[in-house]
């Protein structure tokens, strides 16, 4: 099974707070003896790099290869080094002397303190050792060492989703950096703030195919909001500030800062303006018109038009995505809009949890594997209010046949699609919006709410009620007396039953295969007093299973629920439906997950029958919250996920569960 998800529920453990005073700028005299000793080692290391670089330049200058394109702006070995960037000399500009005499690694440490970083996820290596040496035994933040850099990236994602702070990743050059590409792409797709720092070979060796050299700036250009190589130690504080600013501005996302070894090992000799060393200061960053958010004040006329369209709508529908979760007030304002306007709500997969699923106005998830009634409602709504969603193909189905009623209403000027979006580039990218409202979704909702009027819409809710009754989520339960394996739905239902009392404190998120376990570890680090549950398929779990050892080593109390069907479930479903049951390389031969977990010091239990599920689930949930635990459920191999909208089909052309198909055929007969 390839599904991966993590689920967080609040428990009754008392919350503790730790008071920590951070010094925003430090003089040399304030540095601890550990740092003074570390600096001496770093200085000697910097001198060695300088000597080695000079020697290598003489030896190899006649055969130096052409640099890779992304590095062509760097100084070559045979050209004199670029002079240090010119700094303001006007006596009125205040200068920060606290970094003078510090190595690049020590400056990195101090900048993490100034940005109030509490946790870093990463893996050391030669090119990043000056930074790791500088943070050695630091008491100011915790470092989590995963078993693989991909794990570090996903841990930072989980941490960011729960804490609201950017996740910080620190890895070495070459393979260390490239192993974080998947988490960065995942974070870019889902709008998760990550700040990734990676080591790089010395600037004098760039372009020479040096040991573990990789053009990570070029490689990561398409999977980050912004990336940069720090070419001089005087740039380091500014680049770190820029990274945190860009990662959290507008639609959040990942950024990458490439740190050559001679920059992190070098020593700063000149003071820097406070403007570039102080977090939150104006950095005069260039703006990208396709990413720059627009404030609500510039959209007031469009907001009034949108409210008027909503008030006159007969069949409106709210389509909410992950963007609503970007602000703590987002779910509150969404609920207010739904109730005050009496409007049904459907959400994307990433938007699950943004609206109360037990509310009668909830249509649950929409799209390829969404509810049948949500898909039908989208096709018949005359006004669609899209909040923080981007109309991806899993939601729209066949675009030319998406939301036909809203398009007809738009042509008649009585309806259409209202798109609340923070990034201009996402407007009209897939579906044309009748009224695009740019800017922060929460701010714009706050401006529109006073203009919304209540309407009964009896006929609309009558249709929705009939769809819910006609097309519910269904499955056939297992029969333990016949030795049948558990259905995965039974596991999820039992989990839901035993955690129902925490309904108001649930955060659900999903990611790529391999995301679940490390993301849950990061989430638990960010919210140690919460219960964090990773719901994983066996195929997804296998990709990052070694991170159980990380949870064990650092006493991170995640709960890992593995649904083991010995198949790559989603792919197998396609092979059954569209490829004549030809299971091309989708069957898994798994290790004994219980023994594997125990080998890593993790308590593990297994369930084979539905009759023992309640007892084992109770043990799983009540296990020590400071230690990891694994529950393996052996589930039916051929259970599929329905409804399903086939690729290239419209939402109303969805495939229903066989029980509903048979019922529909009998009714028509």
Regions found by a protein language model. Give the residues of each.
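Active-site diphosphate/adenylate-binding microenvironment
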Residues: 108-109, 113-115, 131-135, 466-516, ...
